[in-house]
Amino acid sequence: MNKVKVGIVGCLGRQGRHLVSEISASDIAEVSAGLVRIGSEYVGKVLGVVIGCNCDAKITDSLEHLFDVSDVVIEFTNPNTMIECMKMAELKKKPMVSGTTGISEDMVFQDYIKSVPFLWSANLSFSMNILLKLVEDATRMLSGYDVEIWEIHHRYKKDSPSGTSLMLGKAAARGMNVQFRMNQYIKGGQESRQDNKSIGYAVSRGGVGLSDHKIIFAGDEDVIEFSHRATNKNVYAKGALKAALWLIGQPCGIYTMSDMMVTQ
């Protein structure tokens, strides 16, 4: 059986390296090529040699070539690169998975990609997406509780709050049956909560490998907490590969991890 060929955009990034290693260990998928910035010193080199894993794919700086040699493409980059990838996916009629965060709330994926399957999630961890469902259900049952979301990420994390924290907030808002609106409260009581339909955020940055999220339901007599801690970026790589393999068999459309999970 031929292996599914997976192209990786941002193959030498923090997440990209984990993706290369995860896919290279798969029995049903292989890395077709890895994309780096134009003019990079790594263009033409063997990806496995650079990263240190069993991967024979070459590194390229041509987005078009990457799509040409791939059955499906995965990207963890930045919003601008993500848009270019969506345009190329549409042109080449190839499915694409994106885990890029920091995108505008106003972005409409259908403006760029219409005729191929596309899956986006701010967090591709299977367990985090289970937590999102638990949060929505808990919020629905805990009417009258204040909702606060806390996160800590490595010092290099650019978006704040993280895409995952926003997903948690939106899950809570669905449970409240209200329009999502983000409120960030300043520590020390300088800003007061207006009602228990609002969602507070607290953000911390530090270290190099941290990724913790906690959602707190604070009532008058008790406090309930849900938390998720990613101890290794492989959890996102595993989710991304699972999503990519699933996406290949889907009709054109915009998908989330929730869509995939209901079919498992």
Swiss-Prot record:
It catalyses: (S)-2,3,4,5-tetrahydrodipicolinate + NAD(+) + H2O = (2S,4S)-4-hydroxy-2,3,4,5-tetrahydrodipicolinate + NADH + H(+); (S)-2,3,4,5-tetrahydrodipicolinate + NADP(+) + H2O = (2S,4S)-4-hydroxy-2,3,4,5-tetrahydrodipicolinate + NADPH + H(+). Pathway: Amino-acid biosynthesis; L-lysine biosynthesis via DAP pathway; (S)-tetrahydrodipicolinate from L-aspartate: step 4/4. It comes from the Bacteria. It is an enzyme of class 1 (oxidoreductase). GO terms for biological process: diaminopimelate biosynthetic process; lysine biosynthetic process via diaminopimelate. Keywords: Amino-acid biosynthesis, Cytoplasm, Diaminopimelate biosynthesis, Lysine biosynthesis, NAD, NADP, Oxidoreductase. Its EC number is 1.17.1.8. It holds the Pfam family DapB_C. GO terms for molecular function: 4-hydroxy-tetrahydrodipicolinate reductase; NAD binding; NADP binding; oxidoreductase activity, acting on CH or CH2 groups, NAD or NADP as acceptor. The active site is at 153 (proton donor/acceptor), 157 (proton donor). Catalyzes the conversion of 4-hydroxy-tetrahydrodipicolinate (HTPA) to tetrahydrodipicolinate. This is 4-hydroxy-tetrahydrodipicolinate reductase. It comes from Ehrlichia ruminantium (strain Gardel). The gene is dapB.
